[in-house]
Amino acid sequence: MEYNEYEPEPQYVEDDDDEEITQEDAWAVISAYFEEKGLVRQQLDSFDEFIQNTMQEIVDESADIEIRPESQHNPGHQSDFAETIYKISFGQIYLSKPMMTESDGETATLFPKAARLRNLTYSAPLYVDVTKRVIKKGHDGEEVTETQDFTKVFIGKVPIMLRSSYCTLFQNSEKDLTELGECPYDQGGYFIINGSEKVLIAQEKMSTNHVYVFKKRQPNKYAYVGEVRSMAENQNRPPSTMFVRMLARASAKGGSSGQYIRCTLPYIRTEIPIIIVFRALGFVADKDILEHICYDFADTQMMELLRPSLEEAFVIQNQLVALDYIGKRGATVGVTKEKRIKYARDILQKEMLPHVGIGEHCETKKAYYFGYIIHRLLLCALGRRPEDDRDHYGNKRLDLAGPLLGGLFRMLFRKLTRDVRSYVQKCVDNGKEVNLQFAIKAKTITSGLKYSLATGNWGQANAAGTRAGVSQVLNRLTYASTLSHLRRLNSPIGREGKLAKPRQLHNSQWGMMCPAETPEGQACGLVKNLALMVYITVGSAAYPILEFLEEWGTENFEEISPSVIPQATKIFVNGMWVGVHRDPDMLVKTLRRLRRRVDVNTEVGVVRDIRLKELRIYTDYGRCSRPLFIVDNQKLLIKKRDIYALQQRESAEEDGWHHLVAKGFIEYIDTEEEETTMISMTISDLVQARLRPEEAYTENYTHCEIHPSLILGVCASIIPFPDHNQSPRNTYQSAMGKQAMGIYVTNYQFRMDTLAYVLYYPQKPLVTTRAMEHLHFRQLPAGINAIVAISCYSGYNQEDSVIMNQSSIDRGFFRSLFFRSYRDEEKKMGTLVKEDFGRPDRGSTMGMRHGSYDKLDDDGLAPPGTRVSGEDVIIGKTTPISQDEAQGQSSRYTRRDHSISLRHSETGMVDQVLLTTNADGLRFVKVRVRSVRIPQIGDKFSSRHGQKGTVGMTYTQEDMPWTIEGVTPDIIVNPHAIPSRMTIGQLIECIMGKVAAHMGKEGDATPFTDVTVDNISKALHKCGYQMRGFERMYNGHTGRPLTAMIFLGPTYYQRLKHMVDDKIHSRGRGPVQILTRQPAEGRSRDGGLRFGEMERDCMIAHGAAHFLKERLFDQSDAYRVHVCEVCGLIAIANLKKNSFECRGCKNKTDIVQVYIPYACKLLFQELMSMAIAPRMLTKHLKSAKGRQ
């Protein structure tokens, strides 16, 4: 559609079809989005791109393996051919659905459920066509080629992301999923490695091929630095960074050095003056060089800044000398001049700015681009434009599963080809037949990918440059915590650096990152979460754009003289300068029009920078973008009839979201393009701007937000009225919502998760937000609507504790189940010996625990329904003792115990036992123990507003206050929790909940809507209550009315996973560490409680010397040691024979016994091992005593 077709229409009554849409209609559009995309689309699309395109590209770009036999010199034997060349090349790759091979060699389709239960890896086999060519060159110069094709050679297994297009669950209906034992609400987006679910966390990085100019903080050698991290589009090398630096005015000697500009080149040790680089590229005359930097000779200020650099390079006046100057500073020293010049040429061609081109004739392009970097540096130095912002989100790219796995696969495939090469070379040299089946080690790729996904160390094992924590175990506490984990991203900045800048919320993150959801503490602001409607681009090829630009009048460098550049607009595609254009306005309009018609990929970003006279087009991967309504002429292009058509659809498949994008009602805008748009916040703002243009911000809105509440992420979208809370409270709730108990998946009965928490009676909240329906929070809730009173009652709810109604608890209020799984397998200990499940026999088994073995069946497993308590054995397992070992021990033992017992602090029921075989065909078992957790004093609860509290007291219903209607609260919260924390959202939620309960419908608490407290109060008054939610209550102990009115109503509360039963810990005597003989640490090891430095200081301040000695010495690690009085070192003591001596002093009499901490004795002996003698002198103490 053309832009000029729209005349301003006459003001008549609008037709029903052309009616404007309302904010309510926007939710139909949002529903269409989530129906089509789901919540982890960014993971799935990225992985699909890797499987469908990247892998084949990596195989294609690997060069053929070429092998020439090393000539064996056989004097009498004349060979038939002058030489033989072997060539091996890889072709098409094939990937099947995920398969598994049983230990007996049978293959079968693998389903995720089986992979989880049997600890298998959910991966698909990868095959590739290999061609082997043998070229034999005769003595007469003719060639004979034998070609042999191997089709579908197995080269490894690739882990498959669940719900991606190669997964067995892809596009299954709800019914099919349920039959496969999968949860229909599970979004996929993770891998299963050895039975555990792994997520790839998106990694943030600076964008490549982008010129940044930064001002250095003085004092510094440099005033300004321009940098570009250059990386060719389809290349597998690390980016080569080029710096162009302007030296600061005053040099170290105090003299003025002039502002020289120098640049770094890869593999060159020192910085090279820029003019020399230009001359080495073949631009010798000063005029030519300046034309490529300044473009406009009338700009005297800029020319002046370049004068020192020209003078510095005055000595070098032709290309060869310049190349030699560079070559001399290269890595190799002492080669001939020709070699040096060739080396410098190669570096300039292949290593400097590789994204501009690494071919033969890129000198002009390179010179222009290099000049552009300097031009930007000078603009900044002259103060004509500000320095770049490192933290701007347009300058960031996200590495998702696709690029991460791509880099890994590329590395492993290279390794594979190297191995093939060395194997074939060996075969050829020894005159063996080349068998490709043996040459290709499939284990390289299989175990490489598996290792990285399993450990999270990205890169080879123990190599430098590996990133840790890229892959993490999927958090399965609550459904919301799972979703949030799949949408998380990480900035690889050291957590130690106390830099505030990268952690702060940047304006450009609006709508891309959630402003509330980030952890507290050292990772604050570095770990972020995606907002709800973000889409991360997967990247598309740049060549359609380049062709389009060529057709639409872009002039490239060969066609123009540098003097036209200041008038024209520079055009960049993915950071590469491709030319200039005289009519950028038309070009941008055309590009956008094509993008809205989907003739150009919808994820292409078009940025027109008017001040810099640049047009930047991006097609690369990893940019954050989000959908917006398109506005034309202050009207939305989407009309009521389109919404109506959307609501009338029969099924989700037919024209939904993608249809709206294709029709040009909605487009994706990335962070950088967002800077060039004018976005209206709500649809009503747009209407206001049309009705009262004089009051409007602008006459030309270009886009409109679909809904402002979509700037929040998964966890913050669950908070009601977050716009009425102080911001840190929303951050706290985002963290706590991930620890709430609910139902984390619907198939939890069939899963054997290590830890699982399930609430008995979860309820959907009375007060909801519109985003919840897309997060499935109503189907899988994590909390209960409790009747909450805000009041002081008895004083047992001080300091963030709450009083709970014991009668409600007895009725099942907040009761929950806790599952823990134990696993064990029969490992092979060599060829014949293997472990065995079975009930150990006290007579013949050594090393048996002191726990009870009675709960075990004959197969060595506790049957389901058995009640077990601390240290009961639940899996019995023994290994045979080898003969030579048995000789030393008493001969009656034939086996050794390797059983697994319940954790000593837990009790419960055996819930389920799974006995199966793992990938190696060995038997292995998982036992799930279930325990019921009833709320008790000390358990932690929280509302949805970051108001966490522990239970301080439980009162029965008779002791709780009650209203005239006979309502008693379930929870009483202290009023002091409200004023300083300013969580007004909780109060509004409470009265809204009261109205909702009365009218029997959900209250809407979506942020940034026009719901006001007054409206809710009026509705509450209509229901016959005091309008602000206060009620008259009666004291439960005395029955007299309480003097104050009490604020009471339903509030949604969450039970958090921190329970007192899991934390309670005390110890008298117990286990000690072997090395220091001090008490062990931690509840799991039954450890002691540390009396730390601060406690010690308090005791010193009190002057409680005896208590201090008791804590730090008698109760910790008292140790008796014998000391020689002569030298003060530890003496030899034999208490059985009652003989003592110090051999160094030949002293057997003057020996005293002292008590010191064992840790101190250890330190002394460690010092002795370093030839330092700490002497414990007791003599003068003794003499001092004698004098008294």
Swiss-Prot record:
Catalytic activity: RNA(n) + a ribonucleoside 5'-triphosphate = RNA(n+1) + diphosphate
Ranges of biased composition (kind: Polar residues): 879-892
GO molecular function, a single term: zinc ion binding
Gene: NRPB2
Cellular component terms per the entry's GO annotation: mitochondrion; plasmodesma; plastid; RNA polymerase II, core complex
Keyword Magnesium: yes
Source species of the chain: Arabidopsis thaliana (Mouse-ear cress)
InterPro entries in the record: DNA-dir_RNA_pol_su2, DNA-dir_RNAP_su2_dom, DNA-dir_RNAP_su2_hyb_sf, RNA_pol_bsu_CS, RNA_pol_bsu_protrusion, RNA_pol_Rpb2_2, RNA_pol_Rpb2_2_sf, RNA_pol_Rpb2_3
Result of knocking out the encoding gene: Defect in seed production due to female gametophyte developmental arrest.
PANTHER family, sorted: DNA-DIRECTED RNA POLYMERASE I SUBUNIT 2
First and last residues of each zinc finger (C4-type): 1124-1145
Keyword DNA repair set for record: no
Binding, Zn(2+): C1124, C1127, C1142, C1145
Enzyme Commission number(s) of this protein: 2.7.7.6
Protein name: DNA-directed RNA polymerase II subunit 2
